[in-house]
Structures are given as C-alpha cells and as structure tokens.
C-alpha cells in the first residue's frame, strides 16, 4: 500500500522586514534643509531649534547647519540644528 502520511503545517516562519529606523545624521554632522535627521516611532527624540517633525515623527532639518543632540532635565532629548552663521559667532 503506497500511502504517504500528510505533512503537518508549520506555524512559524513569518517575520516582518526591518523598518530602517534610527538616527540618520549624528551630532556634529552637517545637514542642509530637508535632510532627515532621525526616523522614529513616537517621540524618542524631540524637535529643537530649526528642526521639524513629520506626521510619522521623522525629524528633519529646516536650515543648513550642524546637528546637536541635547538632553534636558525633564528627561527628554532634543535635536537642534545650529545654523552656520551661529557657529561662526561661537
């Protein structure tokens, strides 16, 4: 009798692709307007000076300058872009 037992179905074997989140421009890096600084879910980093936030919480530069991450006493980390003119004055 040439019978073959039915194979069981596996309940594993699924995974979602990585979403490529995280910091794209680190502290001290030069950015131009529109450059993405960080992609995130929720506000892991908050927008500071010259930084905008998209509908998906993406942080982006509004002006040309240097990226700066700063932790405040309230426990939040703010990301700012210091304009080039401001850096020359320092």
Swiss-Prot record:
Q: Where is the signal peptide?
A: none
Q: Which GO terms describe its cellular component?
A: cytosolic large ribosomal subunit
Q: Name one GO molecular function term.
A: structural constituent of ribosome
Spans annotated as Disordered: 1-20
Query: Pfam families this protein is in?
Result: Ribosomal_L27
Q: Which GO terms describe its biological process?
A: translation
Keywords, alphabetical: Ribonucleoprotein, Ribosomal protein
Which InterPro entries does the UniProt entry name for this protein?
A: Ribosomal_bL27 (IPR001684), Ribosomal_bL27_CS (IPR018261)
Q: Which family, according to UniProt?
A: Belongs to the bacterial ribosomal protein bL27 family.
What PANTHER family would the database entry show?
A: LARGE RIBOSOMAL SUBUNIT PROTEIN BL27M, RIBOSOMAL PROTEIN L27
Indicate what this protein is called per its UniProt record.
Large ribosomal subunit protein bL27
């Amino acid at each position: 009798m040439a019978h073959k037992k039915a194979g069981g179905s596996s309940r594993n074997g699924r995974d979602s692709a990585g979403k490529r989140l995280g910091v794209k421009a680190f502290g001290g890096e030069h950015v131009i307007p529109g450059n993405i600084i960080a992609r995130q879910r929720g506000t892991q980093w908050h927008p500071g000076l010259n930084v905008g936030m998209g509908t998906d919480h993406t942080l982006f530069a509004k002006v040309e300058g240097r990226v700066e991450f700063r932790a405040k006493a309230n426990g939040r980390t703010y990301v700012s872009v210091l304009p080039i003119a401001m850096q020359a004055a320092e």
